[in-house]
């Protein structure tokens, strides 16, 4: 049997178009998708228009069926170890958000440090996420709360269940109803997110900004959110499907270098139990280089948050909180000192949460409890509870 090259027809071009849409449902690199598409185009030339269109339709139907199966069976959830990544999405105004109007319960088997470093320390727990219509972790939409909490994954409560969030402790224990605008990012993201919130709700709220010692001290550049073009918005429809997310995760796992993050985990024994620390955050905590305003530019960032910004809170790394059991030498405090200086220049009050977290760590240790997850970089329910008490005390001074 000999193969003969067929002249391209309308059916051939339709087959190419349909097959390209089917391939976009797979989260593979562009180079791989293009290679497969070129191979299909070559095969279609020999198959003829009708056969090519039938094959393309079969590929599209198969992709749609796979997408349904992955969604219906929960396979997509199985590739994520916590809701933080599973529910992550993007918004043209706010940037990173969670999937809006979603409630999800997941058995989180381990934290981010165990995921990165495989240190053998695991604290499994149930994690419930509930999001509002904007895609932030609130039980209801914004309804005029006086305070809006802005910050990264610690403010958002990345590894914690909904009832343990700062906003929940503040509302239930201290009768201060606040709104959670937290999501992983840096100072650029906090400014953009706050401005987007102002566009929606005006200036009749006060911003409490949470700055994390571990990864928030990067330069503020005034970077705005790039507005996606028509092609990017179209491709985002594919990226939101279960099949794309599932295959993308499988690809990343297969291409991940073995042992790439194994050196990131520092395991120490505290209170008779193993606790893991992120070496990068340990290095940040031990930094003795003076941080300069002409490098980080936090002052214009704080100015950009006016007139809403009312208070800044400094969140220490887990290593700083537990340093008294690990290091015999006093730690430097360059991040706090810089933030204090920048806040003073911007005329915004700032408060350090380190002392209350350290005191609670001392109090809880004899009971075998901690204020940060032993397998994660984030604080746990104990940490957010004691932090909320201090936050409530400070915010009360800003209430009429």
What are these regions (language model features)?
Residues 1-146, 204, 217-222, 226-227:
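N-terminal secretory targeting modules
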Residues 3-8, 371-400:
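Histidine-centered active-site loop/cap adjacent to the catalytic His
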Residues 16-20, 215-307, 314-337:
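Serine-dependent acyl-ester chemistry module
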Residues 52-58, 65, 318-354:
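Substrate-gating cap/lid alpha-helix
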Residues 74-176, 192, 256-291, 296-303, ...:
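Membrane/wall-proximal cationic-aromatic binding patches
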Residues 156-158, 187-189, 216-221, 319-324, ...:
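Short catalytic/ligand-binding loop motif for oxyanion handling, primarily in non-cytosolic enzymes
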Residues 176-187:
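A short beta-strand-loop structural module common to alpha/beta enzyme folds
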Residues 185-196:
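Structural motif
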